[in-house]
From Swiss-Prot:
One of its GO terms (molecular function) is dTMP kinase activity. Phosphorylation of dTMP to form dTDP in both de novo and salvage pathways of dTTP synthesis. ATP binds at residues 10-17. Belongs to the thymidylate kinase family. Pfam families: Thymidylate_kin. PROSITE patterns: THYMIDYLATE_KINASE. This is Thymidylate kinase. PANTHER family: THYMIDYLATE KINASE, UMP-CMP KINASE 2, MITOCHONDRIAL. The gene is tmk. Keywords: ATP-binding, Kinase, Nucleotide biosynthesis, Nucleotide-binding, Transferase. One of its GO terms (cellular component) is cytosol. Its EC number is 2.7.4.9. It comes from Yersinia enterocolitica serotype O:8 / biotype 1B (strain NCTC 13174 / 8081).
Length: 212
């Protein structure tokens, strides 16, 4: 089977790390072992520096919403062009912790940045490049934030209000409802059930690719 780009999405505390482990185990059970992992923002030296600025800020300077989204897209295009596309070209599968859907949901939904600007940024920076499959881990923000807080110190974005994450989730769900490549997983279930749901969805998707 040709190499594919699979992305895991969701709010803070949705369980993306566990989901990644499930995706990898499922792929390997199907004989797919050449797997590259990415995270966004990040994944290249420049993108990691931008990640630190986005997550932590610098010297107390207010990071404007538009500056934030432009930094995210700068980090993203570095990762796509320098890591993801070359990996796919040489036959590796890529499993990503977040991609463009995060910006559409967090900045477009949570921050309220104009949807036309968000679409224009995506199309200008990424062109037609899209993930082959996105697994969106959906859960109420109040649950996700409680999990995130239990992990320890929160970053700049994790400290946003509950209303911010409600808007972000709403945009995630809107986008998932209109894109068949986005599969929604109920991440409020017990962990074992979430992993089973992910594995089933991925197996079905792999089977559909083989018979297409």
């Amino acid at each position: 089977m040709n190499s594919k780009f699979i992305v895991i999405e969701g709010l803070e505390g949705a369980g993306k790390t566990t989901a990644r482990d499930t995706v990898v185990a499922t792929l390997r059970a199907q004989g797919i072992n050449d797997i590259v992992f990415t995270r966004e923002p990040g994944g290249t030296p420049l993108a990691e520096k931008l990640r630190d600025l986005i997550k932590q800020g610098i010297d107390g300077e207010v990071l404007t919403d538009k500056a934030e989204v432009l930094m995210l897209y700068a980090a993203r295009v570095q990762l796509v062009e320098n890591v993801i596309k070359p990996a796919l070209a040489r036959g590796s599968w890529v499993v990503g912790d977040r991609h463009d859907l995060s910006s559409q949901a967090y900045q477009g939904g949570g921050r309220g940045i104009d949807i036309n600007l968000m679409t224009s940024l995506r199309d200008t920076v990424l062109g037609e490049f899209r993930p082959d499959l996105t697994l969106y881990l959906d859960l109420p923000p109040v649950i996700g934030l409680a999990r995130a807080r239990a992990r320890g110190e929160l970053d700049r974005i994790e400290q946003e209000s509950l209303a911010f994450f409600e808007r972000t989730r709403e945009r995630y769900l809107e986008l998932a409802a209109t894109d068949s490549s986005i599969k929604t997983i109920d991440a409020s279930q017990p962990l074992e059930q979430v992993s089973e749901s992910i594995s089933q969805v991925l197996k079905q998707w792999l089977t559909s690719r083989e018979t297409a």
